[in-house]
Amino acid sequence: MDQFEIGDTVIADSRLWDEDEMGPITEVKDVSVGEVFTKVGIAAVYEYDFGDGWMHHLELVDRSTHPTQEVLPLIISGENACPPEDCGGIHGYKELLEVLKNPKHPEYGETKVWVGSTFNPTKFSVNSHTKELGTLNKYMKEYEEGF
């Protein structure tokens, strides 16, 4: 599960949300990024995977227009690799990085197999992530059609 918080407003997927337990929300599919980030300086907190507590601070620092034929959203820059799914949150990821630094660590071999031989925590590829985003967009369309 994930959610966006902008001030007192919570934006989430109502199919995965229990309002009785977690309070009222704005339905994520009823709000566009442009409706939330209306001016430079608007900030939000994005929480991914409630169990692991990945908190991301998002802030609109600039607005620009893009040609209409351009596929959006568009990744223009980034830093470092994404932590592997289900690595145990920030603390689990720190432990994983420590294991990978030490080939003599008892968990090194198993961890290397899990993350893959090409995993590099300092690498970021705009092209690779743009392709992944395209795959995610396709998956999300299929997911929405299933409900």
Can you say where each PLM-predicted feature lies in the sequence?
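Short linear regulatory motifs enriched in tryptophan with gly/pro/ser
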Residues: M1-F147
